């Protein structure tokens, strides 16, 4: 999720039970860590009851970006993940306003979710503007990690890809340093059209402050 106090300032209410049952899931970290088998697999069949292309956004915040994708691709399925509940409540409101039937929001620690994602089930992973967390004591909380890339290499279908955007040069460099350890992933510079396809809140925010937006399209290479 993007940096700053934006989520803390949100004025939102907890979704009513019937709306939450449709759009919202909470997977507590303690239980997910100690009893992962109590949670469903993160695939379209388990979460939506059908086989369909599945996109996962890590750190989706208020769901602006992933709801736009879900609106444009009604036959696909989408899961937005964030560790904080309040922005997800706004994401649920957005999905209801748009009448979406192909999206679920999941409050969970993304690092604990990877074990619940089967092989070759994701067409796209979205990781846009993750927090840098560059203090030494926070390094293990980074979403840009070997653990995340290992999950991407395993869970993306051949030809699928991870979309990565950041305004932070150190995070971009870290991603480039980690990639060579994953031979089935290939990092390509994001094209101008990919960078401009839709600008989320954080994209607009950091671009307006004059920060350079860097991006990679990290493709899952088909095995020969």
From Swiss-Prot:
The gene is trmB. Substrate binds at residue 167. Catalyzes the formation of N(7)-methylguanine at position 46 (m7G46) in tRNA. Pathway: tRNA modification; N(7)-methylguanine-tRNA biosynthesis. One of its GO terms (cellular component) is tRNA methyltransferase complex. S-adenosyl-L-methionine binds at residues 57, 82, 109. It holds the Pfam family Methyltransf_4. Keywords: Methyltransferase, S-adenosyl-L-methionine, Transferase, tRNA processing. Its EC number is 2.1.1.33. GO terms for molecular function: tRNA (guanine(46)-N7)-methyltransferase activity. This is tRNA (guanine-N(7)-)-methyltransferase. It catalyses: guanosine(46) in tRNA + S-adenosyl-L-methionine = N(7)-methylguanosine(46) in tRNA + S-adenosyl-L-homocysteine. Belongs to the class I-like SAM-binding methyltransferase superfamily. TrmB family. Transmembrane segments: none annotated. InterPro entries: SAM-dependent_MTases_sf, tRNA_(Gua-N-7)_MeTrfase_Trmb, tRNA_methyltr_TrmB_bact.
